[in-house]
């Protein structure tokens, strides 16, 4: 069972962090974030979990290693819970986007979320 709240000090979060919300300007090296409609105060694991959940096939090593250069990375269990909560928030996306296989995709996603909820610390082991 997922906890109702993530532990941790609330910080300003994007609320829907994912690779498509980040723009990179090659000429200057600047990074821009977009789409702030879900900005809120929440533990840092919220945005990390959201970003990791956006591409579950990617282990997220580069993101977490870069993050660790500037801030302590939340515990693996916290990240796993954040990933599961983010995937749960996006659960209806296939239906909303009229995907013909929405029923199957939601079923697969629910199974993945249940697996993460049983062992959240295994979801983001990166060290």
Please provide the spans of the model-predicted regions.
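Active-site Asp-x-Gly
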Residues: 11-12, 26-62
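Hydrophobic HxD+1 residue recognition
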Residues: 17
């Amino acid at each position: 069972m997922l906890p109702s709240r993530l532990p941790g000090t609330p910080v300003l979060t994007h609320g829907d962090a994912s690779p498509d919300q980040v723009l990179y300007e090659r000429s200057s090296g600047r990074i821009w974030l977009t789409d702030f409609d879900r900005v809120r105060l929440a533990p840092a694991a919220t945005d990390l979990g959201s970003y990791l959940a956006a591409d579950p096939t990617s282990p997220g090593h580069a993101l977490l290693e870069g993050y660790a250069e500037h801030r302590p990375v939340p515990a693996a269990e916290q990240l796993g819970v954040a990933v599961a909560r983010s995937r749960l928030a996006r659960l209806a996306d296939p239906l909303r986007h009229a995907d013909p296989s929405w029923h199957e995709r939601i079923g697969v996603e629910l199974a993945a979320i249940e697996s993460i909820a049983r062992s959240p610390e295994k979801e983001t082991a990166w060290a």
